[in-house]
Amino acid sequence: MRINLQACFPMLDKIIIESIVQRSVALHLQAMMMLPRNWWGKDQTIINKGRLHNRHFLDDALASERPVVLLITHSAGLDAGLLALAPYYSLQGIYNPLTNPVIDYLVYRGRHRFGAIPLPRGSGFRQLINGLKNGQLMCYLSDEDYGKELSVFAPFFQHQKATLAVLPRLVQKTNAIVVPMIAHHDSDDDGVDVHFFEPLQNYPVGDSVIDATTMNNAIENTIRLQPAQFTWKLRLFRTCPHEGDTRYGQIERGEINVSDL
């Protein structure tokens, strides 16, 4: 967490970095404690706890009658935020199945509330594309480093990051509008604040690096709103642009500095 924060916000001193780390850990733990309520509590309770900000960005995109992709950032309020949307919008998205089938079923059932459609990773994009064409919102997360395969290196907080290059092809195929989104856990009332941002403009242009940079810039903007809400434990800068060990391993051995990411 600290390495990622230092890399993304080099202007902050160690005291501020540590305060963001502690705040982020607390927010994620609090949000996790709310999962049973979110997944199995009363419907009206869930609806009342959700607050949608700048909703017009999403509604205007839907009014265009084009498919819509939600570019979602990993955050403390992620699960609760999607549940806050589900009563009003038809959602679909990819998730990673858990190894324990019982727990996986419980998680799937909770996320399926209000008709949302979680699709196991590996299901393929055909079902997602069909859902988009039928008016379902596609929930797409692309802030994590998934390695070189299917990725290009593009700036993310001024560092080269392996960035999935799948979304531009999906958008080009479906003529979809991409609306960035992040969900914040509210520690005061255990609610969730879902923030929408202006859709990506001139996207895609057909250049994989330019398109990846546009997407990364949009994700950066969602993070800057409240940095402590972001899931900083993600392996953001795992893959080295050149052959060799992961960049985190290189930092641990003192071969490179955080500023060299």
Pin down the residues of each PLM region.
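Non-catalytic C-terminal accessory region of glycerolipid acyltransferases
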Residues: 18, 22, 59-64, 87-88, ...
